[in-house]
Amino acid sequence: MYAWVLDHSPGEYRYGEVPDPPVGPRDVRVRVVASALNRMDLWLARGMPKPPVLPVVPGCDAAGVVAAVGEEVSRWAVGDEVVVNPSLACGHCPECLAGRSVYCASWAILGEHRSGTHAESVVIGEANVVSRPTGRTWEESASYGLCGLTAYRMLRRAHLSAGETLLVTGVGGGVASAALAIGLQMGATVYATSRHEAKRERAVALGAVAAFPSGEPLPVKVDVVVDSSGEPTWASSLGALKKGGRLAVCGGTGGGRVELSLPKLWFGQYELIGSTMGTFSEFDELTRLVASGLSVAVDSAFQLAGYPEALARLRAGQQFGKLVLRH
């Protein structure tokens, strides 16, 4: 099959022929119809992190059609339309059996620890696909996986409730765009920040009460902050919390080292929550939300051959929502 491949890390992606991965007894082969980009695509090429196995096919997210099934697979058949869950786990350890797959010692991410979705097809365990949400486009179906799952778990772990206030920093990125939509779906009053005026305007058009320039003192105090930027927004995120507020962090795209005043933490009665990806049951719940009409922000779509152009747009931070490859 043909795929985008990274032979060295750091390195450059190339498009070429790679062997078809074998289908194990409990695997399915999915013919990819659409795949979505994530920051992981950029990080792998920079060697941050360095993939454990090279060469590797990038791509965490995809939607497609089942093309083959393993001999022990009973829940899927050739022709089924599915979405790929990029959160990998063993499925049989105590944590997995208890529904806490994100704590599995073998937990991994598709497209980082094993070859991913920017290819003609991807082979994945039968538990890692769900039925494609009815009424959603292929592009939308490919776009909610990694970032949507991360945002959903963050808001659940922060116990966001209807009527509470939520601040989403760096709106326009994949996690932030998903958090905006999910927060609104959960009945919260949502605020956002961005460096870009156009993104602030888009956030308000999508339902945010207000959007403010990143890095400036915020005129509101909120119950929950969702932050995926790290160092550049850390101080303002903490400063935006009400007494007893919760700060959920999933990334450090702008820097991974921050300073924390412990007296501020305890006198503010704040909760700090580290979170990434989600469990299989949370992916099922998110998929049901998407099927019921949850907004999925798709910035633009490219042909598979246009992966370099899509990467350039992602690198420049020009997008609002997800960048998608049509296969």
Language-model segments: residues:
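Mid-domain Rossmann-like dinucleotide-binding core that forms the NAD(H)/NADP(H) cofactor-binding site
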Residues: 136-216
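Glycine-rich beta-strand-centered segment in the early N-terminal region that forms part
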Residues: 19-36, 48-97, 133
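C-terminal hydrophobic helical "lid"/dimerization subdomain
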Residues: 1, 280-327
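Rossmann-fold dehydrogenase core element
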Residues: 243-248, 259-300
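Glycine-rich cofactor phosphate-binding loops and adjacent beta1-alpha1 units
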Residues: 189-191, 197-271
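NAD(P)H dinucleotide-binding glycine-rich loop of Rossmann-like/cofactor-binding domains
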Residues: 31, 88-170
